[in-house]
Amino acid sequence: MIYWIFLGLAIATEIIGTLSMKYASISGGMTGHIVMYVMITASYVMLSMAVKRVALGVAYALWEGIGILFITLFSVLWFDEPISALKVLGLVTLIVGIMLVKSGTRKPRKQVTPRGDNHATA
């Protein structure tokens, strides 16, 4: 469970870091750059913690996919970036792809060793 929390934190810090990058580019101040560097670094640290137990393909798909969704949403709301029907279609396709990647990942089964069969044969 803690590894999924790490993944959630990685996603949140990636979103904050990327939005800070945009803010820094339009404001010209150093605050946005500092927040960006700290958040992007934290994002990678949290992602590296998450992939200890979450499958890499799933973690990366969620990290990037959910990040793109929220970054696009906040860019439209806060920075007045345009959004077209084609972008919306792309985001919907992204959501479907993330769901397929997540549902296609299975936990490996534990191998059960029969009792009394632990000796080597020649």
Swiss-Prot record:
The record's section on Pfam families has:
Multi_Drug_Res
Q: How does it sit in the membrane?
A: Multi-pass membrane protein
InterPro entries given for it?
Answer: Small_drug/metabolite_transptr, Small_multidrug_res, Spermidine_export_MdtJ
| Keyword Ion transport in record | no
**Which superkingdom is the protein from?**
Bacteria
Q: Which UniProt keywords apply?
A: Cell inner membrane, Cell membrane, Membrane, Transmembrane, Transmembrane helix, Transport
GO molecular function annotations of the record: amino-acid betaine transmembrane transporter activity; antiporter activity; choline transmembrane transporter activity; spermidine transmembrane transporter activity
Instruction: Please name the GO terms of the biological process aspect recorded for this protein, alphabetically.
Output: glycine betaine transport
Localization of this protein: Cell inner membrane
Q: Give the protein family.
A: Belongs to the drug/metabolite transporter (DMT) superfamily. Small multidrug resistance (SMR) (TC 2.A.7.1) family. MdtJ subfamily.
Q: How does it assemble?
A: Forms a complex with MdtI.
What does the function comment of this entry state?
Catalyzes the excretion of spermidine.
Q: Which NCBIfam families match?
A: PRK10452.1
Q: What is this protein called?
A: Spermidine export protein MdtJ
Per the UniProt record, the lineage of the source organism begins with:
Bacteria, Pseudomonadati, Pseudomonadota, Gammaproteobacteria, Enterobacterales
